[in-house]
Amino acid sequence: MKPTQPLKFLLGLAITCLFSIAQAKIINPNNLVNKSTLGCNFSSEQSVFLSDFYGALLKDKVASKNISGRLYTIKDSDYVLQGFYSIGHNFIHKDKIILEYTGLDLNFKKFNMNILRIAAFSENDNGDENFGYYFIIRDMPEKTSQRMRYLGIEPQNLILEKTSAGNTRLKCILVG
């Protein structure tokens, strides 16, 4: 092999990777945080993405920092994540509740709310199984409920839980 062949190969590989990323759909917090997803509208493209994303990453048990710009293939489509700090995967078994989630950590402000995490989850609560997604919002559930009303989203249709850190978990159940 000539000395220039490995260089040509690496250059070709780099161009192929850049082309793949250029063809990929960009997913950022602005794509995923909107009135539709905050209101648990399950027919939205974003809800479908969160469901597919969870399923794809669940197989790989992915946990990673520095995920921005990385290419992910989910159901034959390529995605590049931007604006997220990390992907985390966790499995919790506590008091007959089994919770498994894959979350995207971020610090994103929209609609006068600070979104800290977007996660897809599956939960088994004493035999009752649920699947969906949730947001962690920096603020108490009462304040989050007021902001939802201001946005025209009825809080009685949402599950707002207080986290151990005093924030709000806005939970949307897709199946269950």
Regions found by a protein language model. Name each.
Residues 2-11:
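Bacterial N-terminal signal peptides that target proteins for export
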Residues 10-18:
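Bacterial N-terminal signal peptides
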Residues 23-104:
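Short helix/turn-capping signatures at newly exposed starts of structured segments
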Residues 72-75, 82, 133-135, 166-175:
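Generic recognition of long tandem-repeat/solenoid scaffolds
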Residues 80-150:
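Long, charged/polar, surface-exposed segments that mediate recognition or autoinhibition
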Residues 142-176:
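Glycine-rich, aromatic-bearing surface loops/beta-hairpins
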